């Protein structure tokens, strides 16, 4: 009879599983709770027929929930989870941390950002435009008091008997009328009024206009001379404006020439208006090439 030797060492859990049941049977999962630590032990068999043990450790936290959440937790389970224990089943439910959403931007922040990106707001401090009605930093067509102050100013001008155009004409000095020859005798051109003056093309003012003339391109077809007057008037006194128009339609060809009395005013107009958005188009302003005439 062979002798039997007893091993005092602790047996492995795999041997215990084999001794507890037949081959292929697994013990039921065990769950132990010690304080706020819950340990769940499960046994499974892999594809190769090997048995292995899974131990999951959970930390129990007590949280206050609303009454509606507490009632939902007491609902009776159904389907394949009808006989599950209270709480989530690790086989069918994945428990993750709560995600709290933080809204960084709001409508006010978006509106403020849009105002910062608006080129009109960037140009307000430069005083390149001035409303004819309220003298504000915006276009006359966008004046909020256009429907109220505009008619009042027009009525006041009519009561005074002067329109806007008549006021400008009254402020301008009338040109000196040439002295007419009352005797009826023939006067040579050299002795007539203005005969000693040089021709208009020889005048230094014409050359000064060429030096203070700028060229504006990428204008819309609906642009008028009054629009250009309103756009460039804040930079200085304008001597003349030439807007190229189509002979048949009368619409703008997309470019114009503006002459200032001072070259410094023309330089400020180039710096202020070049690259400026007007009537959904980006204006291009540069020095005009001097004429050969």
Curated annotation (Swiss-Prot):
GO cellular component: eukaryotic 43S preinitiation complex; eukaryotic 48S preinitiation complex; eukaryotic translation initiation factor 3 complex
Record-linked Pfam families: eIF3g (PF12353), RRM_1 (PF00076)
Stored InterPro entries: eIF3_g (IPR017334), eIF3g_N (IPR024675), eIF3G_RRM (IPR034240), Nucleotide-bd_a/b_plait_sf (IPR012677), RBD_domain_sf (IPR035979), RRM_dom (IPR000504)
Keywords noted in UniProt: Cytoplasm, Initiation factor, Phosphoprotein, Protein biosynthesis, RNA-binding
GO BP annotation list: formation of cytoplasmic translation initiation complex; translational initiation
Domain of life: Eukaryota
Domain RRM positions: 212-290
Gene3D superfamilies, A to Z: 3.30.70.330
Basic and acidic residues bias locations: 194-206
GO molecular function, one term: translation initiation factor activity
Keyword RNA-binding in annotation: yes
PROSITE patterns: RRM
Subcellular location: Cytoplasm
Region (Disordered): 1-32, 163-206
Binding partners and assembly: Component of the eukaryotic translation initiation factor 3 (eIF-3) complex, which is composed of 13 subunits: eif3a, eif3b, eif3c, eif3d, eif3e, eif3f, eif3g, eif3h, eif3i, eif3j, eif3k, eif3l and eif3m.
Family listed: Belongs to the eIF-3 subunit G family.
Its biological purpose: RNA-binding component of the eukaryotic translation initiation factor 3 (eIF-3) complex, which is involved in protein synthesis of a specialized repertoire of mRNAs and, together with other initiation factors, stimulates binding of mRNA and methionyl-tRNAi to the 40S ribosome. The eIF-3 complex specifically targets and initiates translation of a subset of mRNAs involved in cell proliferation. This subunit can bind 18S rRNA.
Protein name as catalogued: Eukaryotic translation initiation factor 3 subunit G
């Amino acid at each position: 009879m062979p002798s039997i030797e007893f091993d005092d060492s602790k047996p492995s859990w795999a041997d215990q599983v084999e001794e507890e049941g037949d081959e292929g049977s697994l013990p039921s999962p065990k769950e132990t709770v010690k304080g706020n630590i819950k340990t769940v032990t499960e046994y499974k068999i892999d594809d190769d027929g090997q048995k292995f043990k899974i131990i999951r450790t959970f930390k129990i936290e007590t949280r206050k929930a609303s009454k509606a959440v507490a009632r939902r937790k007491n609902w009776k389970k159904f389907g394949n989870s009808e006989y599950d224990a209270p709480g989530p089943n690790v086989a069918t439910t994945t428990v993750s941390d709560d995600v709290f959403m933080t809204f960084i931007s709001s409508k006010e922040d978006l509106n403020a950002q849009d105002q910062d990106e608006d080129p009109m707001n960037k140009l307000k401090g430069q005083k390149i435009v001035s409303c004819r009605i309220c003298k504000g930093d915006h276009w006359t067509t966008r004046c909020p008091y256009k429907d109220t102050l505009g008619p009042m100013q027009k009525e006041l001008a009519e009561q005074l008997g002067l329109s806007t155009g008549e006021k400008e004409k009254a402020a301008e000095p009338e040109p000196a009328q040439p002295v007419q020859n009352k005797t009826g005798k023939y006067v040579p051109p050299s002795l007539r009024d203005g005969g000693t003056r040089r021709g208009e093309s020889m005048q230094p003012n014409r050359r000064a206009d060429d030096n203070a003339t700028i060229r504006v391109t990428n204008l819309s077809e609906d642009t008028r001379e009054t629009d250009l007057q309103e756009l460039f008037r804040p930079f200085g006194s304008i001597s003349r404006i030439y807007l190229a128009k189509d002979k048949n339609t009368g619409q703008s060809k997309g470019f114009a020439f503006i002459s200032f009395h001072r070259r410094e005013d023309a330089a400020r107009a180039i710096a202020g208006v070049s690259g400026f958005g007007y009537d959904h188009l980006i204006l291009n302003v540069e020095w005009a090439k001097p004429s050969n005439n």
